[in-house]
Amino acid sequence: MKKILIGLLFGASLVSQSCINDNEDPIAVAPIDGSTVDISVGGPTQPNQVWFDLSENKRVLTKRTDWELAFYSGSAFKVVLNSSIQMAAGKIPNATNIDAVTEASLASLKTQVEVANFDVNNEIYIDDVKGNFPGGYTAIGEVKATDSENSVYLLNMGKDIYNGSVPLGSVTYSGDPRGWMKIQIVRSGDGYKVKYAKLSESTHKEIIVTKNTAYNYNFLSLTNDKEVFIQPEKKKWDLCFTVFTNIITGAGSYVYADFVNNNNVGGVGVYEMKIAAPASGVEAYNNFKASDIQESKFIYNDHTIIGANWRNPVGTNGLEVYNDRFYIIKDADGFYFKLRFSRLTKATTDSQGLAGTRGFPTFEYKPL
């Protein structure tokens, strides 16, 4: 009887193994069934940045104006500007002493360190829009080990969140100018020392930023003189819904609402599936399965793959979502998802606003 049982178990093992193709790798499946998600970027002034974790169906909301600078927590010493509030930075020529820099000496440079003025020359004052950090270009140069090699920069603090009424279906994300600062960043052990002051001041403040490797970045609010929590831990978010400074080829920097970044610094890859007419993009999304995934298509060095490509604010029927495309996402834990957008505006009227209001996109997603 024992021999018969062993034989049956061995046979069952062969049958179960024969169901796995030698050319197929096992697919990690996220611990969630997927969902339809309404995101609150906060309405037509889009005050929020929303950090979303697909595998946990969780989100964290922060205000765009809560921070100005992000300090890379890996081995490189790089500093990133808050593009959601239209920040920019320009090196002050021949300046190594921040306290010696006067406002009068910066009059000419202030006319150049601007965002969204349709000047291709202003691209050097913003960071690599693809977000390919730490390797990508940053307006504030890499922080050197020798203090004297670190320049002083003119910092355009960007724009406040707009405070006023906005017509239904429109967006207005830029408020009053937030002013200017001068800044110099040097190393402090394995972290950063930030020297900063208003342009009219002859003495500066200092903050030490210690790297926390559980996160992509440490974030700093210069206006509040302190570190702040913004992004969740590096493996705890996949997508960010935000206002974003991008580049239009030949026209310089430009600011987009309804933008979606993926967490490429944290290891999230994305590619777009665009379905040619007359085939249905919705049907293609519904039919897409794990065996359709093409690993070679995932892009890990550009966080603008979704970007603003999912919506058309000047469509035939007004504000539209493109129904001919969807996105395949691989998170840092190796989980795969398919995702498509279904609405650009608010679906119903409630305490947060009227139906048709911008800043409330809807998407659906499923694990693969």
For the regions a language model picked out, list residue spans one by one.
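Short, intrinsically disordered low-complexity segments
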Residues: 1-2, 22
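Sec-dependent signal peptide recognition
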Residues: 2-8
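C-terminal motif of bacterial Sec signal peptides marking the signal peptidase cleavage site
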Residues: 15-18
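Surface-exposed, beta-sheet-biased, low-hydrophobicity segments with strongly acidic/polar composition
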Residues: 20-368
